[in-house]
UniProtKB/Swiss-Prot annotation:
Residues 268-277 have a biased composition (Basic residues). The keyword Phosphoprotein applies. PANTHER family: DNAJ HOMOLOG SUBFAMILY C MEMBER 9. It comes from Drosophila melanogaster. Keywords: Phosphoprotein. Residues 15-82 form the J domain. Residues 266-299 are annotated as: Disordered. This is J domain-containing protein CG6693. The modification Phosphoserine is found at residue 239. GO terms for molecular function: heat shock protein binding.
Length: 299
């Protein structure tokens, strides 16, 4: 299938700008932020196993569109004729797109995420996102949980008050699924998040124990100051922490356009490095962001 056919299949439209939520005159910075925001929702390393197959295809489509919209000639071809060049077979490889993604977006630390959460919660930006998610999900609270950053079940009374005020003022329509949510649905959601929280806590403790065992073993094998070794290892882990969302990129990342990847140079490098008997491709590992209650997966 062509890229535009895949756009229609997975996103319901052939309009690249509509899909990316961009104006036709959007610049590279806006394209980059839009790609980051959408790709985080379908990144293969950040979705449950049962969603990986479809999410991988969506991720590849979004990456292709990012490439088109940041390439002057390819974008002009699409703008003028509604055509996307699908000749490069190497673009179908997930590893190529994952490598590009890791080059485009700089790492963000857990401290950055925590600081941003403090600024975001109860801000005007949160209200804007809440309104958009309420309309997008037609009042479904499960949808809100998955689309409003940092929202958790403890926030439901506060969120309901904000939306009720919007309804009362006529800013948004009333959806019965929100104002009269069935108790069974609410109970199921709360049980789901309570279960996921416990599972995440167990996994976190397990990882901490394994890391401590490794640090102790390193000390026994190599000697040295344990505190300095742990600090160095922690800094290394933080430097590899995955990006959370486009607004975090905007706040803590480099705003300069110079960090935009040169796709043409990247493609030439890929083609030049190809050999008849190539070694098995090693997929670059991307650390998913898992900062306690920040992670959201399924409805």
């Amino acid at each position: 299938m062509s890229t535009l056919e895949l756009c229609e299949k997975y996103f319901g439209t052939r309009d690249v700008y509509k899909l990316m939520e961009l104006a036709r005159g959007a610049g590279e910075k806006e394209v980059k932020k839009a790609y980051h925001k959408l790709s985080l929702l379908v990144h293969p390393d950040r979705v449950p196993e049962e969603q990986k197959a479809e999410s991988t295809e969506k991720f590849k489509v979004l990456s292709k569109l990012y490439q088109v919209l940041t390439d002057t000639q390819k974008r002009a071809l699409y703008d003028e004729q509604g055509v996307i060049d699908d000749d490069d077979e190497s673009e179908s490889k997930l590893s190529s797109w994952l490598e590009l993604w890791s080059k485009i977006f700089k790492p963000i630390t857990e401290e950055d995420i925590n600081n941003y959460e403090k600024e975001y919660v109860e801000s005007e930006l949160e209200r804007t996102d809440l309104k958009k998610a309420y309309l997008g999900g037609k009042g479904c609270i499960n949808y809100l949980m998955n689309h409003v950053p940092f929202m958790k079940v403890e926030d439901e009374p506060r969120i309901q008050k904000i939306v009720q005020d919007m309804i009362a003022s006529g800013e948004v329509p009333e959806y019965k699924i929100f104002t009269e949510e069935p108790a069974a649905k609410r109970k199921k959601r709360h049980q789901k998040y309570a279960r996921e929280f416990k599972e995440a806590k167990v996994i976190k403790e397990r990882l901490k124990r394994r890391q401590k065992e490794k640090d102790d073993q390193d000390l026994a094998d190599n000697g040295g100051d344990l505190q300095q070794m742990i600090l160095a290892r922690r800094n290394q882990r933080e430097s590899n922490f995955g990006s959370l969302m486009d607004r975090l990129m905007e706040k803590y990342g480099n705003e300069d356009d110079s960090d935009t990847v040169d796709f043409s140079a990247f493609e030439k490098k890929k083609k030049k490095s190809k050999k008849p008997a190539a070694k098995q491709e090693t997929k670059p590992k991307l650390n998913g962001v898992k900062a306690g209650r920040v992670e959201k997966g399924k409805n």
